[in-house]
């Protein structure tokens, strides 16, 4: 018995039905795919020292190419153009965080120290001198290094491994995946303000400073114990009646495309300043609405102004260094530093010498010979 011959149209229809069934089977077994945001190529960190809070990896921020249409843009230095391209970017992955115990108990003074990835020697010196975590007259001090990533990928791999080892041993590294540079110091400040809101709100006061300052933290505690952390406090080396530098070769060059005004608000030099938790919250509110400005200490002055607050001065903060009364007197005499709060700047070995000298019970000042 012969089977009826099928027409070409029937065969084509059967093939199409079979393909449709196969496609339905395949799609039912695997979920639909979606594009994932770009992430740092860093390996997952050891959960032994991570905070335990789930972390999202933000999508990589894209350049705002529209700024390049400005007629003055092409003539700007490369780092200024780079800043303008990415001025709007504020969300970067966290590579490393401190241990959960960092702020588990109330902190009287949080030492938030800006450091570059390569500055291992400075960080080590601070850990053993003025930034050592301890209690001063019952007030707990905690330490935090704020770090970005090296611009060069090969160097970044080495430094990031170094920072990972430091984080595992000391639990004091807070690192983000952005290029650590002078013009990104403001970004570092803004990210720290947001991090503090989530992970260290119980810090009464903050020392915000560089890793090459000498801070007399014992004197800072004495000074701060007379202040209310829930009142405005922002003190350092006050700078006022100055404006943007328009000379392109200057490190502090600010073209009119970045800031058209010719006057900065009052601010404290970025080498180091003290602030209360009240003022930390005020800075955070302002930083969320103000456009980024590349010089971090000026930006914080802008934030204070936006909140109707003013920076204050303290004679014990010397971000321009110490100047002796006579050229025959050494500026490194510890007697000049005994009653100060902070001096900028110090080499690591000078940090150790000064810390040791100031902690000598036999240190005598006045007519006696200087220690150095």
UniProtKB/Swiss-Prot annotation:
Glycans are attached at residues 64, 184, 202. It catalyses: a 3-O-{beta-D-galactosyl-(1->3)-[N-acetyl-beta-D-glucosaminyl-(1->6)]-N-acetyl-alpha-D-galactosaminyl}-L-threonyl-[protein] + UDP-N-acetyl-alpha-D-glucosamine = 3-O-{beta-D-GlcNAc-(1->3)-beta-D-Gal-(1->3)-[beta-D-GlcNAc-(1->6)]-alpha-D-GalNAc}-L-threonyl-[protein] + UDP + H(+); 3-O-{beta-D-galactosyl-(1->3)-[N-acetyl-beta-D-glucosaminyl-(1->6)]-N-acetyl-alpha-D-galactosaminyl}-L-seryl-[protein] + UDP-N-acetyl-alpha-D-glucosamine = 3-O-{beta-D-GlcNAc-(1->3)-beta-D-Gal-(1->3)-[beta-D-GlcNAc-(1->6)]-alpha-D-GalNAc}-L-seryl-[protein] + UDP + H(+); a beta-D-galactosyl-(1->4)-N-acetyl-beta-D-glucosaminyl derivative + UDP-N-acetyl-alpha-D-glucosamine = an N-acetyl-beta-D-glucosaminyl-(1->3)-beta-D-galactosyl-(1->4)-N-acetyl-beta-D-glucosaminyl derivative + UDP + H(+). GO terms for biological process: poly-N-acetyllactosamine biosynthetic process; protein glycosylation. It comes from the Eukaryota. Its EC number is 2.4.1.149, 2.4.1.146. Pathway: Protein modification; protein glycosylation. It is a single-pass type II membrane protein. This is N-acetyllactosaminide beta-1,3-N-acetylglucosaminyltransferase 3. The gene is B3gnt3.
